[in-house]
């Protein structure tokens, strides 16, 4: 991958800042790019445009265009990722990347562009590392007896972590977070179900520690068969993505997740699991309209997760006709309210025990005497919840080892949480 030049342009195609890294593509091609953009409608726009042997790879952000040009057979995905990393870095520096912040920070942006890319190849794109030596006031480097001294993270192999970090209390927090996307038909059939998971960490560790994370044997990764792992009753995770700190070669060899963590919060890995999921909270709704004068609802909610677990902050959002009025509610647990701005009833249950517990809510609405004869399409019932200490996939952390040359003791904390994602029940 090699980008020839990078341009930051306003919505009309005026170049605000540009940097020519290789000199093999004329800088004047930026005007051709904006002409092509203006010719196309927004729906037809693609992130890559090719013309006269030149590739234009761009991202639109806040009415700005970040454009990379190249005439080589470049890795377009890598260039796109770099442009998004540029946005992330600029947002870290200026809070919001927009035309005004660019005009106010020309010098800093040029310095960042020079450090983030060299001769068209990405270098350091970690905001915390860049902030060590490029500040809002300008470019600052320490000078020692032998001349200029760059921060160690720039010259070392671990670009995402600086040296010399020190904490009085060494701790690492690990959260396994899973969201469930679910769609159930009006007759109770699960049409779509998916688990989207992430392992998030907050590192407060001194020095340059190495961490080793072990997961339970039930969890398999894609292509596990290549390593001779037995499939059996294992759950195979798909679309697994790791933070750049993970040693992929070691993971490919023995499925060990070994890494030197960045300082602070980061996402260690994400994954997806396409499998039939039993709805953790099951909802049934029966509605009855009486002579176009009133409508009544009976909503039943039932837990279908382990009895020892509790779902917190459960919200069941039941759509009602937009012309409904004079609401009346009765529920066996929790509170109900009418949200006219959403045309919905919101049934809130602070704590919903597992083990098959069942609750009931009844609602009554008046309807205008004159109504639209054309039946309106009914939006689905939406459910929101949070179940701590619970994962649907069964993923568990067997161990989290922390190894540092000074030999200090560190406290690892592990939490699990299951959340509702796009969780819907269609109604008849």
UniProtKB/Swiss-Prot annotation:
The listed locations are:
Golgi apparatus, trans-Golgi network; Cytoplasmic vesicle, Clathrin-coated vesicle membrane
Annotated InterPro entries: Adaptor_comp_med_subunit, AP2_Mu_C_sf, AP_mu_sigma_su, Clathrin_mu, Clathrin_mu_CS, Longin-like_dom_sf, MHD
Gene Ontology MF term list: clathrin adaptor activity
May I ask which residue range the UniProt record assigns to the signal sequence?
none
> SUPFAM superfamilies per the record?
Second domain of Mu2 adaptin subunit (ap50) of ap2 adaptor, SNARE-like
Which Pfam families does the record match to this protein?
Answer: Adap_comp_sub, Clat_adaptor_s
According to the entry, every stretch annotated as the MHD domain falls at: 169-426
Gene Ontology cellular component list: AP-1 adaptor complex; clathrin-coated vesicle
Question: Which residues carry the post-translational modification N-acetylalanine, per the record?
Answer: 2
Keywords in alphabetical order, please.
Acetylation, Cytoplasmic vesicle, Golgi apparatus, Membrane, Protein transport, Transport
Phenotype when the gene is knocked out: Cells are viable but display a severe growth defect and a delayed developmental cycle. In this mutant, phagocytosis drops by 60%, the protein transport between the TGN and lysosomes is probably defective and the contractile vacuole is lost.
**One GO process term, biological-process aspect:** sorocarp development
Write out the similarity annotation.
Belongs to the adaptor complexes medium subunit family.
Q: What this chain does, per the record?
A: Subunit of clathrin-associated adaptor protein complex 1 that plays a role in protein sorting in the trans-Golgi network (TGN) and endosomes. The AP complexes mediate the recruitment of clathrin to membranes and the recognition of sorting signals within the cytosolic tails of transmembrane cargo molecules. Also involved in early steps of phagocytosis and macropinocytosis.
Assembly mode: Adaptor protein complex 1 (AP-1) is a heterotetramer composed of two large adaptins (gamma-type subunit and beta-type subunit), a medium adaptin (mu-type subunit) and a small adaptin (sigma-type subunit).
Question: What name does the UniProt record give this protein?
Answer: AP-1 complex subunit mu
Q: Which organism is it from?
A: Dictyostelium discoideum
Gene name of the encoded protein: apm1
């Amino acid at each position: 991958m090699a980008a020839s030049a990078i341009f930051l342009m306003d919505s009309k195609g005026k170049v605000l800042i540009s940097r020519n890294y290789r000199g093999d593509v004329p800088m004047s091609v930026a005007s051709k790019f904006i002409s092509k953009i203006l010719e196309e409608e927004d729906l037809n726009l693609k992130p890559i445009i090719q013309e006269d042997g030149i590739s234009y790879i761009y991202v639109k952000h806040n009415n700005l265009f970040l454009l990379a040009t190249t005439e080589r057979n470049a890795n377009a995905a890598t260039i796109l990722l770099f442009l998004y990393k540029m946005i992330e870095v600029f947002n870290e520096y200026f809070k919001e990347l927009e035309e005004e912040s660019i005009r106010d920070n020309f010098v800093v942006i040029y310095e960042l562009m020079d450090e983030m890319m060299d001769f068209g190849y990405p270098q350091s794109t970690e905001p915390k590392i860049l902030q060590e030596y490029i500040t809002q006031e300008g470019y600052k480097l320490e000078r020692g007896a032998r001349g200029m001294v760059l921060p160690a993270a720039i010259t070392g192999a671990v670009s995402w972590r600086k040296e010399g970090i020190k904490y009085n209390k060494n701790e690492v927090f690990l959260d396994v977070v899973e969201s469930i996307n679910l769609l159930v038909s009006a007759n109770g059939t699960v049409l779509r179900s998916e688990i989207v998971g992430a392992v998030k960490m907050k590192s407060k560790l001194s020095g340059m520690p190495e961490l080793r994370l072990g997961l339970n044997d039930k969890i398999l990764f894609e292509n596990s068969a290549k390593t001779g792992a037995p499939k059996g009753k294992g759950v195979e995770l798909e679309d697994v993505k790791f933070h750049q700190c993970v040693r992929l070669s070691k993971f490919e060899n023995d499925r060990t997740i070994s890494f030197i963590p960045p300082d602070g919060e980061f996402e260690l890995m994400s994954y997806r699991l396409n499998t039939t999921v039993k709805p953790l909270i099951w909802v049934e709704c029966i509605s009855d309209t009486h002579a176009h004068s009133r409508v009544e609802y009976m909503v039943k909610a039932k837990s279908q997760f382990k009895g020892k677990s509790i779902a917190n902050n459960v919200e069941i959002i039941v759509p009602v006709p937009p012309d409904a009025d004079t609401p009346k509610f009765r529920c066996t647990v929790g509170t109900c309210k009418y949200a006219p701005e959403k045309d919905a009833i919101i049934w809130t249950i602070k704590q919903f025990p597992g083990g098959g517990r069942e609750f009931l809510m009844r609602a009554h609405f008046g309807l205008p005497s004159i109504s639209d004869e054309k039946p309106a399409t009914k939006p689905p019932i939406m459910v929101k919840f949070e179940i701590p200490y619970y994962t649907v996939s069964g993923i568990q952390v067997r161990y989290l080892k922390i190894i540092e040359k000074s030999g200090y003791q560190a406290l690892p904390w592990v939490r699990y949480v299951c959340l509702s994602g796009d969780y819907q029940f269609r109604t008849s």
